């Protein structure tokens, strides 16, 4: 099948999972699902948890499937090490990973590229204040954290300090971003292909950690209800944003569609979740790609 490497030619595969970030538990779930899929496909794949094993031991593998989420796995650090070791790996390289992890710098890059993204600013100190160009309500979040950890919707200045405190517990760089009223969508990217978009629906104030991984009432609408032209427009925008931020191989771009029908880029995820609640497998299934094939094709992107 096109894009799927021959297990006999791949060699040993390390599934890098777990780690020490705040997203360790999600990483273990993603990595476990990926490992099982690779083994079902006939690959010589093993779990490798850098919390318990030195990364130097990766020298004994031929390719690494990165299933780490958050710092130390999604921010370019492990990618840099693997580059030095000369071992191919799944997903984006050092630059794309670092930019994808840093929501503020990614936003600035998109703004400089003329891509639509909500107004935002960094918050600092014990008395954070919004600039005039960023009005309430806002979403306050750690600039370098995933899975919507540490995020709060803020309706007015009296709530800002507490939201800053919550976000700062995860990262010393805190971003305030203008709230976009409308519907949230996400687009998964696999190689050169934008997979069918997903429209997200949740009774929560936004698509937070609980909505992503715990809630049973979160709606994942795929197909999303967009017409063919709208679907193509959204897919092209997300591919452009992904490429502009240095993304490669596979990933996901989250967007909002405001009440006027305009798209707004929120963030890039260079190592999306692969759990039973995750979005990329849902989009792939809509495109006729089963989970095992999806995992094998992601591996194949690393070996192109």
UniProtKB/Swiss-Prot annotation:
InterPro entries: ATP-grasp, ATP_grasp_subdomain_1, D-Ala_lig_Van_CS, D_ala_D_ala, Dala_Dala_lig_C, Dala_Dala_lig_N, PreATP-grasp_dom_sf
Annotated organism of origin: Halorhodospira halophila (strain DSM 244 / SL1) (Ectothiorhodospira halophila (strain DSM 244 / SL1))
Record's cofactor remark: Binds 2 magnesium or manganese ions per subunit.
Protein name: D-alanine--D-alanine ligase
Gene: ddl
Cysteine pairings via disulfide bonds: none
Enzyme Commission numbers on file: 6.3.2.4
GO cellular component labels: cytoplasm
Subcellular localization: Cytoplasm
């Amino acid at each position: 099948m096109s894009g799927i490497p021959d297990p006999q030619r791949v060699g040993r595969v390390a599934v890098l999972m777990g780690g020490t970030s705040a997203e360790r538990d999600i990483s273990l779930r993603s990595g476990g699902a990926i490992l099982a899929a690779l083994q079902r496909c006939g690959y010589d794949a093993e779990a490798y948890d850098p919390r318990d094993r030195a990364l130097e031991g990766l020298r004994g593998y031929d390719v690494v499937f990165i299933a780490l989420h958050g710092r130390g796995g999604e921010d370019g650090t492990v990618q840099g090490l693997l580059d030095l070791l000369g071992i191919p790996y799944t997903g984006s390289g050092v630059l794309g990973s670092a930019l994808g992890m840093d929501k503020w710098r990614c936003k600035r890059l998109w703004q400089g590229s003329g891509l639509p993204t909500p107004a935002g600013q960094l918050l600092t100190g014990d008395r954070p204040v919004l600039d005039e160009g960023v009005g309430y309500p806002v979403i306050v979040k750690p600039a370098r954290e995933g899975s919507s950890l540490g995020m709060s919707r803020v309706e007015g200045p009296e709530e800002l300090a507490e939201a800053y405190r919550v976000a700062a517990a995860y990262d010393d760089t805190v971003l305030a971003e203008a709230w976009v009223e409308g519907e949230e969508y996400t687009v998964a990217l696999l190689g050169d292909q934008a997979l069918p978009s997903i429209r997200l629906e949740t009774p929560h104030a936004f698509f937070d950690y609980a909505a992503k991984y715990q809630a049973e009432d979160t709606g994942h609408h795929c197909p999303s209800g967009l017409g063919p032209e709208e679907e193509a427009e959204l897919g092209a925008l997300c591919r452009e944003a992904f490429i502009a931020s240095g993304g490669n191989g596979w990933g996901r771009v989250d967007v909002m569609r405001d009440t006027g029908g305009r798209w707004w880029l929120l963030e890039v995820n260079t190592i999306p979740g692969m759990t039973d609640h995750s979005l990329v497998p849902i989009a792939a299934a809509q495109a006729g790609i089963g989970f095992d094939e999806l995992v094998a094709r992601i591996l194949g992107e690393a070996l192109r």
